[in-house]
């Protein structure tokens, strides 16, 4: 499996689904509501309800759950570090001791809470990029940030920068995979030896990768300049964004679901 197939962050999966057909602003706002609401969960047992909600949205989007969960792969080391940090260094009632290592009940609680929360955060954010094209993301973010233009905030430029950054992730992964295969075909040993040897072996990969990134950035700049791109001033859209009944229904159902999950935790807990 190539690197681009292992990591889905920033990739768009086209499909004919109710989630894909929603206005990008609806999906962005719904994702923000979900992400902020996840920080209100205090008991890891209640993440089960959030997992069911994620699975239901994935079912509606017609994107495989495996593809969505692959978006967690880039933060796997951060996930392991976060879980170990809370499990080993949270003070409380010790339930396991090994020399100077102590694992407390409160530490396991916090490790489970932070670990599952991080997985759900990345999964919901990854689902947004999987079901929304880069152009739709740019238009949606620009529209949501447009009120800030009154205070001279560059809403269009900011949205364009974020979209280009997201779009470059799959490109970087594809180029990295191509360079790795080329180096391996020449007999390069990229996985053998210790850490220092592996870092040295990756130097022939990083140098051409940086050159390709700069070349891609220059090509993009020339393409935008040749099309007389001057920013968001006077820019029109081939498909103007419009709120539909489905968008209001989706926002309402999402808000009710999030409020219901938070209320259930408070009522039971």
From Swiss-Prot:
<dbReference type="InterPro" id="IPR003339">
    <property type="entry name" value="ABC/ECF_trnsptr_transmembrane"/>
</dbReference>
<keyword id="KW-0813">Transport</keyword>
<comment type="similarity">
    <text>Belongs to the energy-coupling factor EcfT family.</text>
</comment>
<comment type="subunit">
    <text>Forms a stable energy-coupling factor (ECF) transporter complex composed of 2 membrane-embedded substrate-binding proteins (S component), 2 ATP-binding proteins (A component) and 2 transmembrane proteins (T component). May be able to interact with more than 1 S component at a time.</text>
</comment>
<feature type="transmembrane region" description="Helical">
    <location>
        <begin position="153"/>
        <end position="173"/>
    </location>
</feature>
<dbReference type="Pfam" id="PF02361">
    <property type="entry name" value="CbiQ"/>
</dbReference>
<keyword id="KW-0472">Membrane</keyword>
<keyword id="KW-1003">Cell membrane</keyword>
<keyword id="KW-0812">Transmembrane</keyword>
<feature type="transmembrane region" description="Helical">
    <location>
        <begin position="110"/>
        <end position="130"/>
    </location>
</feature>
<feature type="transmembrane region" description="Helical">
    <location>
        <begin position="244"/>
        <end position="264"/>
    </location>
</feature>
<comment type="function">
    <text>Transmembrane (T) component of an energy-coupling factor (ECF) ABC-transporter complex. Unlike classic ABC transporters this ECF transporter provides the energy necessary to transport a number of different substrates.</text>
</comment>
<feature type="transmembrane region" description="Helical">
    <location>
        <begin position="75"/>
        <end position="95"/>
    </location>
</feature>
<dbReference type="GO" id="GO:0005886">
    <property type="term" value="C:plasma membrane"/>
</dbReference>
<dbReference type="GO" id="GO:0022857">
    <property type="term" value="F:transmembrane transporter activity"/>
</dbReference>
<dbReference type="InterPro" id="IPR024919">
    <property type="entry name" value="EcfT"/>
</dbReference>
<protein>
    <recommendedName>
        <fullName>Energy-coupling factor transporter transmembrane protein EcfT</fullName>
    </recommendedName>
</protein>
<feature type="transmembrane region" description="Helical">
    <location>
        <begin position="45"/>
        <end position="65"/>
    </location>
</feature>
<keyword id="KW-1133">Transmembrane helix</keyword>
<dbReference type="InterPro" id="IPR051611">
    <property type="entry name" value="ECF_transporter_component"/>
</dbReference>
<feature type="transmembrane region" description="Helical">
    <location>
        <begin position="202"/>
        <end position="222"/>
    </location>
</feature>
